[in-house]
Amino acid sequence: MEAAITQRIQYPSWVDCRKVECKPQRGSLRYSQQVKVDRRFRGLSLARLQPERRNDQRRAVSPAVSCSDNNSSALLETGSVYPFDEDILKRKAEEVKPYLNGRSMYLVGMMGSGKTTVGKLMSKVLGYTFFDCDTLIEQAMNGTSVAEIFVHHGENFFRGKETDALKKLSSRYQVVVSTGGGAVIRPINWKYMHKGISIWLDVPLEALAHRIAAVGTDSRPLLHDESGDAYSVAFKRLSAIWDERGEAYTNANARVSLENIAAKRGYKNVSDLTPTEIAIEAFEQVLSFLEKEETMEIPDGDL
């Protein structure tokens, strides 16, 4: 389940884009050798394209966090973002879209990892339709919240509804789906998700615990019945959940590590990342997966 988390981040308005010339990228032929050639000449890497930020121009981060009641998304409200990053996101979507051939994408990850927010961004720039599994389940239950479903019907009942939702979505094309944190524990769910491309948002447990502690655990049915301070409760339970699910997340076709993105961009904390930056990396990882997939499918004699 995803709780709607709001993280307000202030950004400097100055960006010197005169040093960088950006041209829209176009999809190339779907042949592995051609892909390799195209990739060689796509210009500067994502990291090198970023305008240099001096220490005194680093974004100021406010810990202000709010939570909605419907648990349908982990929404990081970022306000304005760098137009430069928005351009990169659009260009990456244009680059990936021809290779997708209409295949859908499924975002997986721990609760609070931002699947809904990132998924909405990706679907928008691709022109795909977005669905949140938890929201679909709540609608099927006449508006009953996920937390209430757990209380009145139990987790197994909810997991069954989750599988039903994924089964229906798997027959559709050109959709981006935000799954619940526990969707990965049922092998049948992977069968449905692998009809598209699965993307794992890998967020450090400490960061997740801080997010959840800031909004409280009342809306998290799997974090109930614990005593202690909010962060300790969240981190302890998240660690236990990770022990149960961690290996299952590795079944995803693409992994988006927030720690890796932060390191590449010179941030000290993953909380400095914007959803746009995460979505850009997601497209990069999807493209990498698709290129490897093509190479495996094409006989050596055709290379």
UniProtKB/Swiss-Prot annotation:
Q: Which CDD domains match?
A: SK
SUPFAM superfamilies annotated for this entry?
P-loop containing nucleoside triphosphate hydrolases
Q: What is its main location?
A: plastid
Q: Any idea where this protein resides?
A: Plastid, Chloroplast
The note on cofactor binding and number reads:
Binds 1 Mg(2+) ion per subunit.
Q: Which domain of life is it from?
A: Eukaryota
Would the keyword Disulfide bond be found if you checked this record's keyword annotation? yes
A molecular-function term among this protein's GO annotations: shikimate kinase activity
Top enzyme category: transferase
The reply to whether Metal-binding figures as a keyword in the UniProt entry is yes
**Induction comment from the UniProt entry of this chain:** By heat stress.
Q: What does the record note as the disruption phenotype of the gene behind this chain?
A: No visible phenotype under normal growth conditions.
Amino-acid positions noted as binding Mg(2+) in the UniProt annotation, renumbered to this chain: 116
Q: Which UniProt keywords apply?
A: Amino-acid biosynthesis, Aromatic amino acid biosynthesis, ATP-binding, Chloroplast, Disulfide bond, Kinase, Magnesium, Metal-binding, Nucleotide-binding, Plastid, Stress response, Transferase, Transit peptide
Q: What does the entry list under GO cellular component?
A: chloroplast
Cofactor annotation: Mg(2+)
Q: Which InterPro entries match?
A: P-loop_NTPase, Shikimate/glucono_kinase, Shikimate_kinase/TSH1, Shikimate_kinase_CS
What is the E.C. number?
A: 2.7.1.71
The reactions it catalyses are: shikimate + ATP = 3-phosphoshikimate + ADP + H(+)
Task: Quote the record's binding site residues for substrate.
Answer: 134, 159, 181
Q: What does this protein do?
A: Catalyzes the specific phosphorylation of the 3-hydroxyl group of shikimic acid using ATP as a cosubstrate.
Entries under PANTHER family matching the protein: SHIKIMATE KINASE, SHIKIMATE KINASE 1, CHLOROPLASTIC
Q: What else is known?
A: SK1 forms a homodimer in solution, which may facilitate its relative thermostability when exposed at 37 degrees Celsius.
Quaternary structure and partners: Homodimer.
Q: What is this protein called?
A: Shikimate kinase 1, chloroplastic
